């Protein structure tokens, strides 16, 4: 059985490898209500207790307006963790599905949510935004870029958005989706089920299914892809500080 301590240890390694947290940071955690954003919040709140670089946390939910999504459990969790929480009601669902009737609603919805997040976190004095993208998300995004665009591309572990003056960090990149789900269940986190009609019908789901099929014959296919992303090196991905140390040691031995 996993523990929050062990889980947070892996998160810390990712944070350290990519220099995600600096002293005095006020980090907004983007909380969708899904398992990944909640385990990210739990891990960062735990890490905050002993991390050598003092930092503050704040939870922010952009409520897109889909019916039946109750965030009261998330609010209670934040209260118990001593993390300020803000839920921002929006009409994103109405704009995307009713007014615009987008053929690709996920893209516009994502942009609008990110814009609302950036605005809210700046209003609350936050300088960094922690997102719940994990190991599997990174591999899937890379494969989507390859299969659908013919490019080798993925979001970065740390991204500075100059127009918004916001630094995005992704501390869960060393955590697999199943481990995240297991810990969320073990801790009985207040997961809010998405009622979006596009859930599990996207191009991302197609790639997820493809990787699942490949992993039957090649069980470590996701790890191989992730390793390739760090070794290319893909912009912003590698080598990590730990790998630089190992490289220097190998050169000394030679």
Residue ranges and their predicted role:
Residues 6, 112, 175, 202, ...:
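Conserved active-site and cofactor/substrate-binding residues in soluble primary-metabolism enzymes
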Residues 63-65, 91-93, 161, 174, ...:
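Short, solvent-exposed coil/turn elements at secondary-structure transition points
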Residues 56-57, 136-216:
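Catalytic subdomain that performs nucleotidyl-dependent activation
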Residues 1-143, 148, 178-186:
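ATP-dependent adenylation/nucleotidyltransferase module used to activate substrates
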Residues 189-254:
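The feature marks non-catalytic terminal segments
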Residues 83-104, 166, 228, 235-248:
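Mobile, glycine- and charge-enriched loop segments
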Residues 110-122, 158-164, 211, 215-230:
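Short, basic, helix/turn surface patches
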């Amino acid at each position: 059985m996993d523990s929050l301590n062990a889980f947070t240890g892996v998160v810390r390694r990712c944070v350290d490898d990519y220099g995600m947290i600096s002293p005095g940071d006020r980090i907004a955690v983007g909380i969708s209500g899904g398992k990944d954003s909640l385990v990210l919040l739990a891990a960062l709140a735990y890490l905050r207790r002993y991390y050598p670089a003092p930092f503050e946390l704040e939870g922010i939910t952009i409520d897109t307006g889909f019916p039946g999504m109750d965030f009261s459990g998330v609010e209670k969790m934040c209260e118990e963790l001593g993390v300020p929480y803000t839920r921002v009601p929006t009409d994103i669902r109405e704009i995307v599905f009713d007014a615009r009737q987008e053929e690709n609603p996920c893209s516009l919805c994502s942009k609008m949510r990110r814009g609302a997040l950036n605005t809210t976190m700046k209003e609350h004095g936050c300088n960094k935004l922690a997102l719940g993208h994990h190991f599997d998300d990174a591999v899937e995004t890379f494969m989507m870029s390859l299969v659908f665009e013919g490019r080798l591309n993925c979001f970065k572990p740390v991204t500075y958005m100059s127009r918004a003056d916001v630094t995005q960090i992704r501390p869960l990149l060393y955590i697999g989706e199943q481990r995240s789900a297991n810990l969320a269940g073990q801790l009985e986190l207040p997961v809010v089920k998405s009622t979006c009609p596009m859930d599990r019908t996207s191009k991302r789901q197609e790639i997820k299914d493809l990787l699942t099929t490949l992993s039957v014959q090649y069980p470590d296919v996701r790890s191989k892809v992730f390793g390739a992303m760090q070794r290319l090196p893909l912009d912003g991905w590698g080598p990590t500080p730990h790998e630089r140390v190992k490289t220097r040691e190998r050169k000394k031995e030679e």
